[in-house]
Amino acid sequence: MGLLRFAKNVGKSLFGDDDDDAVATEALTKELDDLGLDAAGVEVKKEGEEVVLSGAAASQSLKEKIMTALGNVKGISGVQDNTEGGTEGVFHTVEKGDTLWAIAEKAMGNGAKYEEIFEANKPMLTHPDKIYPGQVLRIPV
């Protein structure tokens, strides 16, 4: 799939700037567990400001959730998807003033489909109104 870019200076803080990649990788893997995302078969490794994924996820949807969960972490500028199979996902970077309704209108042609975007981004999203500029969201297709 390639490299998916994220805003490095926004997101959940899981590790410090001085933590080495091994410590950060452990924190990222724990975050997936805490979110209830089954990353069995997917190897997660932090390399500099990027996360590299390899192996195979159970589904395309799960792989995309793993990518957005890890990429929306403070200090991560990209997720390199080297996993087996799958297709190119559709993503949207939240801009100032965006709402899920507006994103659904733009990406899916119908603002009322905002709930589909919300569901596609659970458990990272806990409420449809809790999005922030720089956050990357999955758009279900």
Language-model-detected regions and their locations in the chain:
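Extracellular LysM carbohydrate-binding repeats and other cell-envelope/extracellular binding modules
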Residues: 69, 73-87, 115-141
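Surface-exposed beta-strand edges and their flanking turn/coil or helix-capping segments
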Residues: 66-68, 94, 106-109, 132, ...
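Residue-level recognition of oxygen-bearing side chains
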Residues: 62, 99, 136
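Residues that form or flank phosphate/diphosphate-binding pockets in enzymes
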Residues: 61, 112, 126
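Secretory N-termini
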Residues: 1-85, 130
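Primarily a LysM-type cell-wall glycan-binding module
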Residues: 47-52, 57, 83-111, 115
